[in-house]
Amino acid sequence: MDLTSWAIFPLLLASIGVYGLYKLLQKLRSGAYLQAAVVVITGATSGLGKECAKVFYAAGSHLVLCGRDEERLKDLVQELNNMRLKSTQLHKPHMVIFDLSDVEAVNTAAKEILHLAGRVDILINNAGISYRGTILDTKVSVDRMVMDTNYFGPVALTKALLPSMIKNRRGHVVVISSVQGKISIPFRSAYSASKHATQAFFDCLRAEMSPYDIDVTVVNPGYIKTNLSLNAVTGDGSGYGVMDKNTADGRTPEEVAQTVLRAVGERRKELLVAGLVPTLAVYLRTLAPTLFFSIMSARAKKRTKAKGFITNSNLKAKITVCI
């Protein structure tokens, strides 16, 4: 080793030590932030929402679990109450039953949430629906239904709870969006539109809430291995009942829930939780849009030919419910 190498070596060790100390302090702050925080989670009966309930409960948060299925929420509460953690004080969760697509029900639910918990520190807008179909064969009523749940529902609940957060000068709004809030792919028009609207709204909200010290985190996951496609219904209400390959190969909800927990604890502004190909697609859309459009066109042509999507009569819009 020459003199320069000997000089660099202690600097490198010092840098590693400083970084390690920074990560330790960050973890401690994150734990203190989540412990005893009042956390509201929509779509808590299954999938990512259910796993988020588990990890935030284990972190010591006070939970308000929201969904449409009372029995499944009761089962989740029982499961959480059966957890035993020596190092963390656990708090009995509350339940609020309502339909996110009903704005009046959302406003009533917000009042009930504040009555039960007294305040809301962290709101996790997780509930939503997914969609499959061609634009030509999709009724406007289907587009509206997707928008009601994925966009207007979270917007209504957020607006109803914001005054309380502003009054307390404390709050954190989280929305589970999608990679498709960043890019649009064929045969996902209603879903992509709802997630693009969600991305835009909460980006605006982040800026407008900064004077009040209220954080906003947008999480953009790719495919998650849940019952998303198994619970699908078609445009006429019949069941779809198929586990899509991309969904089956996706990340586990447990893994994504841990990522959400860390992102909230670190007060991240935005987070992309996706594999290499979707991540590259997001950057390609920005850096080389013409190439991205060509790839999407080729994808649409290939699938149209394979599926025989020619007339309005040969495709039913598929809607996947995840609430």
Swiss-Prot record:
List the stretches on the Cytoplasmic face of the membrane.
Answer: 1-4
| Compartments where found | Endoplasmic reticulum membrane
The residues that cross the membrane are 5-25
Active-site annotation: 191
Binding of substrate occurs at: 178
One Pfam match: adh_short
What protein family is recorded? Belongs to the short-chain dehydrogenases/reductases (SDR) family.
Protein's name in the database: Dehydrogenase/reductase SDR family member 7B
What organism is this sequence from?
Xenopus laevis
Q: Which gene encodes it?
A: dhrs7b
